[in-house]
Each structure stands twice: as structure tokens, then as C-alpha cells.
Amino acid sequence: MKTDRLPRLLVAAAIAALLTIPAGNVLAQGQSDKKAEKKEMKQLNKEANKLADKSDEAANQLGRDVVFCILAAHTSGVGTAQQLRDKFNSLVDFQFGQFVAAVLLADRIDKPLDDIIAKLVAGMSIGQITKEADVNMGEVRSHFGDFRSELARSETNPPTKNCFATNP
């Protein structure tokens, strides 16, 4: 009778071992996903900082009004160049480059610009706001990179028309 128990005990132990392997894999996968998400957020924040720097550089070279014109032309539903300029001018102690990133993020995640600015003022990063909105960080990062490239092109070949200038 004792010999009959041994195979059953071995089978039960083998089944228990097999059941714990997938649970360990799921746990490891969850940790891997968190690391990947953290890395993606870090990359997005880095791209947002590069965009902010390029926006400041373009504003110094071309003027903020021109950057507002370019920004309005590359976004939809966030505001006209005039509305964006007025919104920025109403802010206190808010960096121009960070404002540009906030406008592009508002365009990409379909959240009100005021909400994004409030979260940035409260200390959240672009990456945290994007994660909270459950939007693909890689797409937002790509959008930021595309606009940064557009600003660089505009510095090399400045626009011939200022959207704030009135036509005679």
C-alpha cells in the first residue's frame, strides 16, 4: 500500500511544480512590462525635453509668433495661433517649450489643454500624463519628434508669411 502512494505523490508533486511555473512566468512578464513601460516613459520625457529646447531655440531665432503659427498649423482642435499665444501669455512662470509640448500632447491625446497644463503645474511629467490617458507613448514620442523636425526645417527655411500679420 505504501508503494501505491509513492507514484501518486510524485504525480501530485509534478503537477504542483508545473502549475507554479506559469505563475512565475506571469509574474516575470508583469515585471518586464513595468520595466518596458518605465523605459518608454523615460524616452517620452526625454523627447519632450528635446522638443522644449528646440521650441525655445526656434522662438529665439524666428520669434514666438512664428512658432505659434507653425504649432497651430500642425494641430487641430487645440486653438488658433492667436488663441495659443493668448493662452501662453496668460500663464505665470510657464516655460515656452513646455507649453509647445503640452499643446502637441493635447492634440494627440484629445484632452483639454488646460487640463494638461494644470497637471504639468502640479508636477506631473508628460510621460505620466500620457500614461494616465492610456495612449501609446511611442506614438506621442514620434509626434514630438516630427514637430521638432518641422521646427528645424523652419529655422533653415523660415516661413515667408506670419499668420498674425494682416493682409493689406
Regions found by a protein language model. Name each.
Residues 12-22:
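Bacterial N-terminal signal peptides
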Residues 2-12:
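Bacterial N-terminal signal peptides that target proteins for export
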Residues 27-168:
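General marker for long, soluble alpha-helical cores
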